């Protein structure tokens, strides 16, 4: 499996057994100025997250694309 990974936002080969791609987003103190923090990566299962953290998981190559842009 290949997934996009931060910080480079480039497609990388996942380690053996990690067949899920994920996109995790959350806000910190700078969210209103910089936007949400984004983490892209691979996992064996869809990661569990705490309240306030959004996660999207998928299982095809490079399915976790995220459009990075300038905050408004």
UniProtKB/Swiss-Prot annotation:
InterPro entries in the cross-refs: Snake_3FTx, Snake_toxin-like_sf, Snake_toxin_con_site, Toxin_cobra-type
Family according to the record: Belongs to the three-finger toxin family. Long-chain subfamily. Type II alpha-neurotoxin sub-subfamily.
Coiled coil: none
Keyword Mitochondrion appears in the UniProt entry: no
Domain of life: Eukaryota
PROSITE patterns named in the record: SNAKE_TOXIN
Keyword Secreted (UniProt): yes
GO MF terms, alphabetically ordered: acetylcholine receptor inhibitor activity; ion channel regulator activity; toxin activity
Gene Ontology CC terms: extracellular region
Cystine bridges: 3-21, 14-42, 27-31, 46-57, 58-63
Tissue: Expressed by the venom gland.
Pfam family, one: Toxin_cobra-type
Subcellular location, record wording: Secreted
Natural source organism: Dendroaspis polylepis polylepis (Black mamba)
Keyword line: Acetylcholine receptor inhibiting toxin, Disulfide bond, Ion channel impairing toxin, Neurotoxin, Postsynaptic neurotoxin, Secreted, Toxin
Protein name, as recorded: Alpha-elapitoxin-Dpp2c
Function: Binds with high affinity to muscular (alpha-1/CHRNA1) and neuronal (alpha-7/CHRNA7) nicotinic acetylcholine receptor (nAChR) and inhibits acetylcholine from binding to the receptor, thereby impairing neuromuscular and neuronal transmission.
